[in-house]
Regions:
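N-terminal amphipathic/basic-hydrophobic helices that include classical n-h-c signal peptides
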Residues: 1-13
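Accessory beta-strand-rich segments of carbohydrate-active enzymes
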Residues: 12-15, 19-23, 31-33, 37-38, ...
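Residue-level detector of alpha-helical hydrophobic segments embedded in or interacting with membranes
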Residues: 27-32, 67-70
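N-terminal helix-cap/turn-to-beta initiation motif at the start of protein domains
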Residues: 39-48
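Predominantly extracellular/luminal regions of secreted and cell-surface proteins
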Residues: 49-71
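Histidine-centered catalytic/metal-coordination loop motif
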Residues: 66, 78-86
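Juxtamembrane "anchor/assembly" segments of surface/extracellular structural proteins
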Residues: 70-72, 76-78
Length: 147
């Protein structure tokens, strides 16, 4: 079931809207296209799909991630599977475990995000690799040295 969600903030009610797009979402193959078709790389891995997530009240990495979110959808959107808004003073954490082959000596591994809402800090193996501020702007991090 694919639904998008509109929240009426004035009355605090949730209205579910179904669209042609939302009905076609396949959680096992979410937006698989390369983001810049004219610049395709041969070693590209799309990380859209299910991620673990958690809401917390502290800036420390949570011990448990008790929710599942469908990336690239925002947590407020029903397509994400979360349908919850981040409250003031809360932190939203995403976690995804992947296994990568060690890159060749002259190669680097870049982690690219198409967007993040305002402030994001990326941890690789629990070490901060990059911090980004700027809502809905793309950013990248060279994570080779953190692997």
């Amino acid at each position: 079931m694919g639904l998008s969600l509109l929240q009426d903030r004035m009355r605090g009610i949730m209205i579910q809207l179904q669209t042609k797009f939302s009905r076609q979402v396949d959680e096992h193959n979410v937006l698989p296209e390369y983001p810049r078709p004219s610049l395709v790389r041969t070693s590209y891995l799309n990380l859209n799909g299910r991620w673990e997530c958690a809401f917390s009240k502290t800036p420390e990495i949570p011990l448990s991630f008790d929710l599942s979110i469908l990336v690239p959808f925002s947590p407020e959107c029903q397509l994400s599977g979360v349908s919850r808004q981040l409250k003031p003073g809360e932190y939203l954490w995403y976690r995804r475990t992947i296994t990568l082959a060690k890159p060749q000596q002259d190669k680097r591994i870049l982690l690219h995000f198409g967007a993040a809402d305002q402030t994001a800090e990326v941890f690789v193996n629990r070490i901060s690799a990059v911090r980004h501020c700027g809502g809905y702007l793309p950013f990248s991090a060279d994570i080779t040295d953190y692997l």
